[in-house]
Design a protein with these regions (language model features):
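Short acidic/glycine-rich loops and adjacent helix/strand connectors
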Residues: 1-125
Length: 125
């Protein structure tokens, strides 16, 4: 949730294989299109309005319970501060309540390393 889409995923790693069990994305295109770009304050409010619902939807789709979760991750930057704050607060709240580790993910590194979801390549690349 670093800009204008709120997203929640449940991911598992079994025997080195990474599986995306759920990936729920809520676009804000309809909110921002009349302005010709993203309005940070509107984006932050929209993230706040849906994050709890998306977490529930992602968990329901994954068919896991919170006790099956090993860690909680969230984009921690770079990005628009409001969206980042909503995502990090939601993730840290879950992390604390579930007594699970919190993993802060650099937005740009997440994009660069996403290839490793399908291919285990060695650094540097």
């Amino acid at each position: 949730s670093s800009c204008d889409e709120t997203s929640v995923s449940v991911v598992e790693k079994v025997n080195g294989q990474i599986n995306i069990l759920s990936n729920i994305v809520k676009s804000q295109l309809d909110i921002h299109q009349d302005f010709g770009g993203v309005v940070p304050e509107l984006a932050a409010r929209a993230h706040s309005d849906v994050i709890d619902k998306l977490i529930k939807m992602a968990m329901d789709k994954s068919r896991l319970s919170f006790r099956n979760i090993d860690a909680i991750a969230s984009t921690a930057g770079p990005g628009l501060m409001g969206g980042l704050l909503v995502g990090v607060v939601a993730a840290k709240t879950l992390s604390s309540a579930l007594k699970k580790p919190f993993i802060a993910v650099n937005h740009l590194e997440g994009h660069a390393l996403s290839i490793r979801l399908e291919t285990d390549i060695d650094f540097p690349y």
